[in-house]
Amino acid sequence: MKRTNMKKARMEQSRRPKKNPLKAEGIETVDYKNYDLLRKFISERGKIRSRRVTGLTPQQQRQVATAVKNAREMALLPFHSR
């Protein structure tokens, strides 16, 4: 097998759909006051994690991003961590 074909085959094997964490917990809407839930979607540097990492749907990702931004404005979450 050629090197490019092996690389492609390996990538196809490793791709699995992520499990949706909001669906697993039975959450339909994301609230900015739910600090523990929002911390799951923020990196150690304080950035919002991408859909590819979290496994959320596009609508849920928008809800999480809006909730995180609101929580930052209300001083429930830091804008960045050191």
Swiss-Prot record:
It comes from the Bacteria. Pfam families: Ribosomal_S18. One of its GO terms (biological process) is translation. Keywords: Ribonucleoprotein, Ribosomal protein, RNA-binding, rRNA-binding. GO terms for molecular function: small ribosomal subunit rRNA binding; structural constituent of ribosome. The keyword RNA-binding applies. The keyword rRNA-binding applies. One of its GO terms (cellular component) is cytosolic small ribosomal subunit. Residues 1-24 are annotated as: Disordered. InterPro entries: Ribosomal_bS18 (IPR001648), Ribosomal_bS18_sf (IPR036870). Binds as a heterodimer with protein bS6 to the central domain of the 16S rRNA, where it helps stabilize the platform of the 30S subunit. PANTHER family: 30S RIBOSOMAL PROTEIN S18, SMALL RIBOSOMAL SUBUNIT PROTEIN BS18M. Part of the 30S ribosomal subunit. Forms a tight heterodimer with protein bS6. This is Small ribosomal subunit protein bS18. It comes from Corynebacterium jeikeium (strain K411). The lineage of its organism: Bacteria, Bacillati, Actinomycetota, Actinomycetes, Mycobacteriales. The gene is rpsR.
